[in-house]
């Protein structure tokens, strides 16, 4: 497995399965990560996951992704979606293609959740499909980085 995809989970996603399950679903973050790793392995793709409640740690991991040779990033920036120019600048700085993923439909929620600092630079945005959104994003990323045979 030479190609690697990085999945970054933002603040409070460590509480998945416990925090507002009617909004975010009943799967834990570990459940989602394991499902994604299995999906990636089926295509001979390596998958790394990272979660932090700290903006700076997420920025550092994005920077490290370039050093590590990551080919694609899937990011659920959670609340940082609406506030973080730093995460936006980090993603632009490393120039790794990324997809923005949200479990809930942010456009059907509070008005402050309607703006994203990332979406205009993302390859795409997937929201409102629960954990399935990560799988949709991973399918696309695999297609983009896998050599055609």
Curated annotation (Swiss-Prot):
Protein name according to UniProt: 3-dehydroquinate dehydratase
InterPro entries: DHquinase_II, DHquinase_II_CS, DHquinase_II_sf
GO MF annotation list: 3-dehydroquinate dehydratase activity
Catalytic activity, EC: 4.2.1.10
Organism annotation: Acinetobacter baylyi (strain ATCC 33305 / BD413 / ADP1)
The UniProt record lists the keyword Magnesium: no
Top EC class, one word: lyase
Gene encoding the protein: aroQ
Oligomer and partners: Homododecamer.
S-S bonds: none
Record has Lyase as a keyword: yes
Record field: catalytic activity: 3-dehydroquinate = 3-dehydroshikimate + H2O
Pathway(s) it belongs to: Metabolic intermediate biosynthesis; chorismate biosynthesis; chorismate from D-erythrose 4-phosphate and phosphoenolpyruvate: step 3/7
Sites where the protein binds substrate: 76, 82, 89, 103-104, 113
Keywords, in A-Z order: Amino-acid biosynthesis, Aromatic amino acid biosynthesis, Lyase
Active site, UniProt feature: 24 (proton acceptor), 102 (proton donor)
Family named by the database record: Belongs to the type-II 3-dehydroquinase family.
Record's function text: Catalyzes a trans-dehydration via an enolate intermediate.
